[in-house]
C-alpha cells in the first residue's frame, strides 16, 4: 500500500477532484506492479485531450499519468505510444538481435507502464465504456483493503485477457478436457513439448514428480495416460493455485498433489519430469520466470538433484528448447557437459522443430534463430557406479 502525497492537475487533464478515476487528494491507495516497481510518488491526472506526443514527453520526464476519460481512447493512447518508440536496429548476429529486442521490450514496458488507472474498492474502473474489471482483479489480488487501487493500464489489460482465457479454457493436444490458465502462469500454447511427452510410453503405474509444474498440463497428460500419482512443485503461488484448480476440474485431484516449493519434493519417484525456463538471462518481472533462468541456475540445480530424487530404475525426462544455443547465450555442447558433471547419462533423446507462430514469422527480429529452433526430450538416468 502506498500513500499519494499529491495528485497534480495538468493542462491536458480535468480537475482531480472531479475526475471519476483519480484518487482523492492525499488518499491512501494500493499500488500493483508485476515488475515490482515502487509506487508513484505523484500522479498527474490526464484525459482524452492528451496527445500521444505530449504523453511521451511527460512520461520521459518521469511522470505517472493517471488516465480518466474513455477506456478505448486510453487503449489507443498505449498503441500510439508504442508506435513512437524506437525499433531495434538491424543486428549482425542472433545474440545482438536478442539483446536489442530485449532492450526495446523493456523500454516499451517502462514507457507504457506510466499510463495508470484507478479502481474503486470493488475494482471497478471509472472510465467511459470500460468493461467489468472486478472479477479479473479479484482473481489475481483477492479483496481490496483500500478504497482505491492504482495499476498500469497495460497490466490491467493483460489481466482482462487472462480472465477470458480462464473462463473459456484452452484445448491442449493430448489432454482430455480443457485447461483453464490463470493470470501470470505460463500459457501452454506451444504443442511441440506436449507431443514429445506423448511419445514416452512407459507411464502406466508410475509415481511422478513434476518440477516447475506451471498450469499442471504435463502432470495431467501423464495422469490421464495411467500414471499412478503426481507430486508437483512450483515456486510461484499462482501456478500452485492454477494447477490445483485444474486438477479438480479434470477429475484428477485425488492423484495430484502440488506444493509451493523450490525444485524437488521429499522422497523419490519413478519418473521426474521438468520443462524448465530455456533462456539463461535474468527475468525482468514475475511472469518472466517461466522463460528466463538467470545463469541457468534452475536447470543446473535440477540436474544436480535429479539422481537423488529417482527411485531405483527411475528416469528423468527433461524437455528443453535449443534457442539459447542458437542465440549464442549458451555454447554448443554445454548441456551435454552438464549431464556429465551431474553424473547423468542420456538413454535417448527425441527432437522436433518448433511450430509456434514466431518460428514462421519472417518479420520477427529473432527469426533467424527461431526458424531453426528445436525442442528435445531427454531421457536421463544416473551413471552406474
Label for each model-derived stretch:
Residues 132-207, 211-223, 370-372:
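SAM-dependent Rossmann-like transferase core, predominantly class I methyltransferases
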